[in-house]
């Protein structure tokens, strides 16, 4: 369990708060809008109405005591940038800020953000891959170069073992696990035989995934 400070309760911030709560983390939620704060009260540990661009308000939250600080302010990049910078000045351990464009990400990283989230960009990429393919069932982007996909077993792999196929050496990807009938098995070995009713959980560089699985 981690302690989380979440600033900005728009649609993304609200959904993030709900997910963090489901994962069992303690969440302090902050927004200027009283209605948004009240809506989030049922699924956060605590919530406050306040202006995150005011250093005295942020200082009163004890930002250095949180494991992670999220800045998910929408519609006002200047406020997001100022909040990010102030959090770091006040000793925040780890700051994740929301960006909509690459240029915003650059400014945020230069002004205190340890990481940047692109919710719209990441969702768009996932949706483009997932819903234009009959054989890709899930896509998780780890960074600009790497991803994990859930993919149907290629026809020429069916009935053969991972060791026989020599997948890691020939394809440059790693089989993390297999799924069958909705159940995931991560205890795969070179002896694991791949069948048509399975899907594979595959980690690799994007260029290798595109080459071997037609992303």
For every predicted segment, state its role.
Residues 1-215:
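Cytosolic regulatory regions of ion transport systems
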């Amino acid at each position: 369990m981690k302690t989380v400070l979440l600033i900005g309760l728009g649609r993304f911030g609200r959904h993030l708060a709900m997910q963090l709560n489901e994962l069992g983390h303690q969440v302090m939620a902050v927004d200027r809008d009283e209605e948004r704060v009240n809506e989030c009260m049922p699924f956060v540990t605590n919530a406050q109405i306040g202006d995150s661009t005011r250093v005295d308000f942020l200082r009163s939250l004890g930002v250095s005591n949180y494991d992670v600080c999220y800045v998910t302010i929408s519609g006002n990049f200047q406020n997001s940038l100022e909040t990010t910078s102030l959090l770091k000045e006040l000793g925040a351990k780890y700051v994740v800020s929301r960006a909509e464009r690459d240029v915003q990400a650059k400014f945020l990283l230069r002004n205190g953000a340890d990481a940047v989230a692109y919710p719209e960009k990441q969702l768009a990429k996932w949706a483009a891959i997932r819903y234009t393919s009959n054989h890709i069932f899930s896509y998780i982007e780890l960074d600009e170069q790497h991803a994990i996909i859930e993919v149907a077993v290629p026809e020429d792999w069916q009935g053969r073992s991972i060791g026989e196929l020599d997948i890691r050496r020939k394809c440059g990807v790693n089989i993390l696990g297999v799924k069958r009938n909705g159940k995931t098995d991560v205890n795969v070995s070179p002896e694991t035989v791949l069948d048509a009713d399975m899907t594979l959980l595959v980690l690799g560089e994007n260029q290798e995934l595109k080459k071997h699985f037609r992303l």
